[in-house]
Amino acid sequence: MRAKVRILNIRSGHFDVFINPKDAQEWKLHPNDLVKIESGKRSIYGSVVIGDFVESGEVGLSLDILDAYQFSEGELVSITPSETPESVRYIKKKMRGEKLRKVEIETIVRDIVDRKLRNTEISALVTAIEVNGLDMDEIAALTIAMAETGDMLDIDRKPIMDVHSIGGVPGNKTNIIVVPIVAAAGLTIPKTSSRAITSAAGTADVVEVFTNVTLSLDEIKRIVEKIGACLVWGGALNLAPADDLTIHVERRLSLDPRGLMLASIMSKKYAIGSQYILIDIPTGKGAKVETMEEARSLAKDFIELGKKLGQYVEVAITYGGQPIGYTVGPALEAKEALETLMTGKGPGSLVEKALGLAGILLEMGGVAPRGMGKKVAREILESGKAYEKIKEIIEEQGGDPNIKPEDIPIGDKTYTIHAQTSGYVTGIDNKAITAIAREAGAPEDKGAGVKLHVKVGEKVKEGDPLFTIHAESESRLDKAIILARRLEPIKIEGMVLQVLGNL
């Protein structure tokens, strides 16, 4: 079957192939059938959508396909119905609770990347892993397969360090301080980060306030070979592409199987050649991991997986019961991070965590004796060496190295919530703070977010400011104010909690 390509201005998040009803009947195609589109050495798989989007003799390709494959308007292609992929049989095997062999896992991952597996089959895979789990051999095979089906970064400058936080705590701009400290010590740390998905700001969103984060692999290699570090958006790269497709399904199912989470994180580390990896697991009420028992179990899995991958992994279990620093939102966090790097001083929760993590990396990389890493990291921060390194990173990635905190625009539509009673701050709800910042417009509106005026344990008087909401529009500010009043994210109590006596 042959047809001319018609490029449609449609983006669905899927590889959709649009067929005219007359052709579909003649070719015996049905909605959601899997077909192979070929032209020369190029081939893609897509799901059939039948409709009058195209004329008879045409095949419509969505923009999703054009993002990944180059087809031209009017190009003649062949269309072939595809049989059920062999990987479906392996998914059924996992649904029965059986262990998958390495070659079976590789086939599944390849079929996900080639779009032979659609969301229905990927959903079955995710559910099977949620119910039956993966052992460490399966997770290691999955991690390597996910990495090797995408691009791989080859950096000559060794050793290659990496740090990753599993997230869940608002205001976590820690790595913007950790990376320049580690690089200033002479180690190599090519840091790829994500944008916010459910948070108010991913590291990439924050860094983008003062420099470009969308770079190619060649650009990253050049920068890292030259200055030892980068802070870029991993989503602009073809690193572990199967991961993005499975994550999309996981979110829709509200599932996060541990085996997939481990493979998701470590596949990207494997792809960029990381040799020494520090995993940060924030733990506490409102964080992704709420108990020490769960944190230790997860840490053990990361370390064991690292051994199987030939990577040395250490894990830091950190306090995650309240936001890090005083700011939540891209521009607010960028301002706070830059101030800390410039002055060598900043909020205790931010500085101490950054120095603690950087110190561990310095010890892992052999540039600081065991037990002395934090001290060395502090010297690098306070001496201004880390600030000079962040300036290099900013400049190499296309930003202004002389940018100052006061140059960063913050949302000028503001509203401050005040204490309704006197007492002590006994809790700050991470999820509520994140929700308010997002309602104000973060992360899309860079200047939107929340600035805290108090932290847990501090004494407040009635009328004292608790936090200020920043927005770029009055409408977003109004919505955030309504949400803030409903959620009441900061809890204040007196020191006397209850009085008992004789009845």
Curated annotation (Swiss-Prot):
Gene: deoA
Catalyzed reactions: AMP + phosphate = alpha-D-ribose 1,5-bisphosphate + adenine; CMP + phosphate = cytosine + alpha-D-ribose 1,5-bisphosphate; UMP + phosphate = alpha-D-ribose 1,5-bisphosphate + uracil
A GO biological-process term: pyrimidine nucleobase metabolic process
Pfam families assigned: Glycos_trans_3N, Glycos_transf_3, PYNP_C
Keyword Glycosyltransferase set for record: yes
Protein name: AMP phosphorylase
Keyword Transcription regulation applies: no
Record-stated family: Belongs to the thymidine/pyrimidine-nucleoside phosphorylase family. Type 2 subfamily.
SUPFAM superfamilies named among the record's database cross-references: ADC-like, Nucleoside phosphorylase/phosphoribosyltransferase catalytic domain, Nucleoside phosphorylase/phosphoribosyltransferase N-terminal domain, Pyrimidine nucleoside phosphorylase C-terminal domain
Stored InterPro entries: AMP_phosphorylase (IPR017713), Asp_de-COase-like_dom_sf (IPR009010), Glycosyl_Trfase_fam3 (IPR000312), Glycosyl_Trfase_fam3_N_dom (IPR017459), Glycosyl_Trfase_fam3_N_dom_sf (IPR036320), Nuc_phospho_transferase (IPR035902), PYNP-like_C_sf (IPR036566), PYNP_C (IPR013102)
Active-site residues per Swiss-Prot or TrEMBL entry: D256
GO-annotated cellular components: cytosol
SMART domains to which the protein is assigned, alphabetical: PYNP_C
Species, as recorded: Pyrococcus abyssi (strain GE5 / Orsay)
Key words of the record: Glycosyltransferase, Transferase
Residues reported in the UniProt entry to bind AMP: G168, S194, R195, A196, I197, T198, S199, T203, S264, K288
Enzyme nomenclature, EC number: 2.4.2.57
Function: Catalyzes the conversion of AMP and phosphate to adenine and ribose 1,5-bisphosphate (R15P). Exhibits phosphorylase activity toward CMP and UMP in addition to AMP. Functions in an archaeal AMP degradation pathway, together with R15P isomerase and RubisCO.
GO molecular function (one): 1,4-alpha-oligoglucan phosphorylase activity
